[in-house]
């Protein structure tokens, strides 16, 4: 296999081999929380590839397959001769058992999903300082029937006799549960034991270390040449702008394309902040009318997205040629995009890797190849929470660092149906009220996203003894850790009342406010 290369010059201390688990990225994030650099690779990475990285330890992730099936994904058998510690998690533990001569079968009547109490039989090595009876998160329908030679039991649960195992001599360990998830109360204790105590990895993956290494990488790659960055004002592109400014100074040009779908006051704030306050060269492109003209009569959300994306590319191409020439295009690619582009998802029926389409932000994905840019992507080794830490260390204000996620097409996909100037003005005013009141209540940083949605229907109302026929506004507030799943936020009734009263009294064209109480799944956070 060939996984995308990262820009950092360092090798990972810990490599996670991904067997298709939904938690593989989370394992890497948890390891990095202990200040140790980790990397996710495909399960079928060769021993030769691993040797080039010289990891101090390997973790085998969970996965949807069963190891006893004909085409079950397994790792390179030579991995067991590398003489480094290996930890198998859930399916990864079963891979370890099978490849080393043990037996795994279906856990008939003994499957475990959800929380289980871990009874510690051997409180040493991997389970040092793990509390007996602590809660661990289970998610398995198979179980170990016979341990390989040299292995011993470390812990059990009511339904799982071998919940944790070890071959101490070879430093091989396995857990049938998921220590990386928040539901496993002593999960981080186990991860630290493996990473720090067993693998002896040094805690040298810090924000300042990354910044220093990234600046050196950019300077070596770019030299004295010019770099163009499409600036959106989100935390990724803002952090990247600050990092590049520190690395190459005036060789950086940022292009801010105002497509007319940003929140109230944001274009002015961004220009004041980046261009005037921090003296980062930002070229402001006012393309509001151009984008709005393209969306006339368009109601389908996917068509709106495609039109906005296509038009962005055209504007970007025209303006880059006008402002250029540029040698490099800077992109805010993050590590989850790198992982996804490597296609490590596994088909449980065939055991084969599933090709996954790379997620592309609408404002950079699909840029014309004849622009002939070379890419510079210094954030591609980072997770989102790490980007925020870097941004904060570089001097980004909290209002950008902790900004709620905002979709690339902006308010255009928070207006259901056709987008018009009147609707945009209405939604901007309503959205500002939502954000102001939630911030005043001290709840902004406790909520993942809070915003308003304008519906393409009108409802009857009464205001000042007069009949009204106006748009309803939907209030959407959700709580989440990563946006993959979300629950609707239980805001105080007094706050909901205040938001509703302000919107119907201060926003022209609105006479009703409704609350979206749908979780994700089954709904999505955005309405379009």
UniProtKB/Swiss-Prot annotation:
The keyword Cell inner membrane does not apply. It is an enzyme of class 6 (ligase). Pathway: Purine metabolism; GMP biosynthesis; GMP from XMP (L-Gln route): step 1/1. Disulfide bonds: none annotated. It comes from the Bacteria. This is GMP synthase [glutamine-hydrolyzing]. The gene is guaA. Keywords: ATP-binding, Glutamine amidotransferase, GMP biosynthesis, Ligase, Nucleotide-binding, Purine biosynthesis. Its EC number is 6.3.5.2. ATP binds at residues 232-238. It comes from Prochlorococcus marinus (strain SARG / CCMP1375 / SS120). Residues 205-403 form the GMPS ATP-PPase domain. The active site is at residues 90, 178, 180.
């Amino acid at each position: 296999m060939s996984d995308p290369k990262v820009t950092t010059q360092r090798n990972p201390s810990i490599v996670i081999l991904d067997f298709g688990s939904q938690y593989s990225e989370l394992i890497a994030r948890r390891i990095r929380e202990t200040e140790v650099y980790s990397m996710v690779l495909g399960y079928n990475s060769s021993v030769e590839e691993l040797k080039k990285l010289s990891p101090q330890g390997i973790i085998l992730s969970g996965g949807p397959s069963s190891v006893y099936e004909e085409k079950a994904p397994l790792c390179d058998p030579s991995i067991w001769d590398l003489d480094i510690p290996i930890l198998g998690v859930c399916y990864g533990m079963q891979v370890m058992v099978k490849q080393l001569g043990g037996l795994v079968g279906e856990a008939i009547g003994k499957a475990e999903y959800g929380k289980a109490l871990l009874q510690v039989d051997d409180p040493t090595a991997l389970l040092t300082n793990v509390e007996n009876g602590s809660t661990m998160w289970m998610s398995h329908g198979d179980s170990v029937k016979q341990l390989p030679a040299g292995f011993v039991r470390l812990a059990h649960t009511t339904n799982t006799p071998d919940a944790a195992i070890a071959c101490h001599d070879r430093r091989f360990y396995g857990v049938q549960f998921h220590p990386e998830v928040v539901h496993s109360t002593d999960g981080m204790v186990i991860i630290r034991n493996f990473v720090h105590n067993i693998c002896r990895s040094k805690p040298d993956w810090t924000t300042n270390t990354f910044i220093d290494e990234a600046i050196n990488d950019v300077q070596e790659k770019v030299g004295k040449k010019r770099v163009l960055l499409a600036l959106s004002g989100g935390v990724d592109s803002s952090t990247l702008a600050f990092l590049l400014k520190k690395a190459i100074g005036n060789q950086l040009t940022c292009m801010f394309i105002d497509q007319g779908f940003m929140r109230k006051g944001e274009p002015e704030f961004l220009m004041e902040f980046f261009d005037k306050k921090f003296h980062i060269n930002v070229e402001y492109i006012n393309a509001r009318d151009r984008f709005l003209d393209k969306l006339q009569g368009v109601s389908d959300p996917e068509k709106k997205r495609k039109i906005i994306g296509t038009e962005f590319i055209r504007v970007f191409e025209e303006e880059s040629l006008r402002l250029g020439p540029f040698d490099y295009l800077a992109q805010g690619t993050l590590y989850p995009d790198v992982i996804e582009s490597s296609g490590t998802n596994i088909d449980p029926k065939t055991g084969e890797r599933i090709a996954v389409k790379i997620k592309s932000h609408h404002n950079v994905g699909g840029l014309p190849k004849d622009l002939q840019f070379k890419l510079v992507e210094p954030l591609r080794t980072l997770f989102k929470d790490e980007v925020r830490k870097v941004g904060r260390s570089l001097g980004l204000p909290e209002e950008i660092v902790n900004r709620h996620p905002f979709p690339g097409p902006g308010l255009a996909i928070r207006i259901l149906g056709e987008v018009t100037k009147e609707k945009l003005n209405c939604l901007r005013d309503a959205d500002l009220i939502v954000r102001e009141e939630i911030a005043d209540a001290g709840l902004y940083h406790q909520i993942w996203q809070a915003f308003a949605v304008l519906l393409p229907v009108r409802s009857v109302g009464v205001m000042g003894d007069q009949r009204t026929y106006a748009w309803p506004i939907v209030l959407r507030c959700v709580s989440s850790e990563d946006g993959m799943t979300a629950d609707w936020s239980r805001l105080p009734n007094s706050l909901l009342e205040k938001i509703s009263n302000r919107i119907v009294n201060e926003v022209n064209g609105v006479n009703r406010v409704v609350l979206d109480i749908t979780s994700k799944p089954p709904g999505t956070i955005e309405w379009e």
